[in-house]
Amino acid sequence: MKGKGKFNARTRRHLRVRKRISGTTSVPRLVVNRSARHMFVQVVDDTQSRTIAYASTMEADVRALEGDKTAKAKRVGELVAERAKAAGIEAAVFDRAGNKYHGRVAAVADGAREGGLQL
C-alpha cells in the first residue's frame, strides 16, 4: 500500500494553516505559491476577495537576475513588499500555503521583511 504522498501532505498542511489565518483590509494575507521552477506571491484581502499586490519570478526584471532560485525568490519578496507599501499596506500575515518554511519560501519572507513589510 502506498503512502499518502507529498502533495496530499502539503494540502493537509495548507488546510490546517488556512483554518487559523485570514487577511483583512488592514492586515492582508501574503500568499506564497511555489512550483518547481517559479514563485508566485500575492497580497490578498480575504474580506473583499481582492488581490492588492502581486509579484512572481516570471517578471522580466526578476528573470534577468543572475543567481539561483533562492536569490530570485528573495527579490520577489522585495518586489511584493514595495508594491504593497505603494498600496498603503504596512503589515501582512504570512501564508506559506502548506509549504515548509525553508529555502525559497523563507527567502520570500526575508525579502518582504527587508522591503519594509511587517510579517
UniProtKB/Swiss-Prot annotation:
One of its GO terms (molecular function) is structural constituent of ribosome. InterPro entries: Ribosomal_uL18_bac-type, Ribosomal_uL18_bac/euk. CDD domains: Ribosomal_L18_L5e. It holds the Pfam family Ribosomal_L18p. Transmembrane segments: none annotated. GO terms for biological process: translation. One of its GO terms (cellular component) is cytosolic large ribosomal subunit. Keywords: Ribonucleoprotein, Ribosomal protein, RNA-binding, rRNA-binding. This is one of the proteins that bind and probably mediate the attachment of the 5S RNA into the large ribosomal subunit, where it forms part of the central protuberance. Belongs to the universal ribosomal protein uL18 family. Part of the 50S ribosomal subunit; part of the 5S rRNA/L5/L18/L25 subcomplex. Contacts the 5S and 23S rRNAs. This is Large ribosomal subunit protein uL18. The gene is rplR.
